[in-house]
Amino acid sequence: FNLPSPLEKLELSTFGVKQKVYVKRDDLIHPIVSGNKWRKLNFNFRFYHNNNYSGVISMGGAFSSHIQSLSFICCQKNIPCVIFIRGQKPKILNDILKQCEINNTKLIFLSKSDYSNNIAIQEICMKNWPNYYFIPEGGSNRYGIEGCQEIINEIDMEFDEIFCEVGTGTTLAGLASSCDKNKKVRGVVVLKGAENISNQVEKNYINLFNRPLNNNVQYLHQYHFGGYAKHSMELINFIRVFYKETGIKTDPIYSCLLYTSPSPRDQ
C-alpha cells in the first residue's frame, strides 16, 4: 500500500481555474483497494483482528468497488467473506462479481425490497453467521469515518476549502470532523434526489460519536448529470480532456463529477 498518498498540485488553467488546486492521490494507494475504499476498510479490519470474529459480512451493488475491495482483502488475509448483492443474479456475471467468486467470496443476491429490509438481513446473519463481523454498505460506520479522518491528518499544508464526492457521506463526515471549523468542506452529491443526505450524515454522525458534525459543510446537488452513474458525451469528453491535461484518470460516477463541480473555478 502506498501510504501516505501523495498530494499533487494541478495545473488547471486550461479549464479557467486561477486558484491553486491540489489533489490527494488516494487512487494511487493500491491498484484494487484504492481511494476511500482503503480508508473506510482499514480501521474496520483493525477492529476485526482485535476481536474474536470468524468472518466478515457486508452489502453492495453488483458494480460496487466496495465489494471488490472487501473481497480482495478477505482473500489475501484468508478471512471468510459473505456479501449480499442488491438485485437478482444476472445470467452473466460482471468482472467484479466474477473476481469475488474467484476470491471464494459467498455472494447472496437479494431483490431490492429484501435488500432494503435491514431487520430481515440481521436475522439471516445471526442465524447463519453469528460470529461474523458486519461492515455496512460502503464501509459507512464509525471505523469508516475514522479511517477517512486520516486523509486530513496526512496533509501538512494550509488550505481554504476541500472538495469530495458524496455517496453515503462517510468520507465527507471524516473530512469535516477532522478539519478546522474555519475550513469549508464541499460535498458533490452523486445521487439525484438526495436532498436529505445532509440530515442523514448529521444524524448518523451524532449516533456514532455523540456530538454534532462541524458546521462547515456545503452539499452540492446539481452535478449528478441526471442521476447516479448517468453520463453524457459532454462528461465523457471532459474525462478525456482532463486526463490529457493532468494525467489523472477519473470515472463518470464519482471522481469526474468532483472536477466538473464549481470548485475553485467559480468561487
Protein language model features and the residues they cover:
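Active-site/ligand-binding loops adjacent to catalytic centers
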Residues: R186-S255
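Small/polar-residue-rich loop-to-helix segments that shape phosphate-bearing ligand pockets
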Residues: K89-M157, Q218-N237
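Single conserved hydrophobic/aromatic residue that forms the stacking wall/gate
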Residues: Y259-Q267
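Active-site cofactor/substrate anionic-group-binding motifs, chiefly glycine-
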Residues: R39-R86
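Active-site-proximal loop->helix
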Residues: Q68-K112, E195-L208
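Positively charged, low-complexity intrinsically disordered leader regions
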Residues: F1-G55
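Short glycine/serine/threonine-rich phosphate/pyrophosphate-binding segments
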Residues: F63-S69, T168-L175, L258
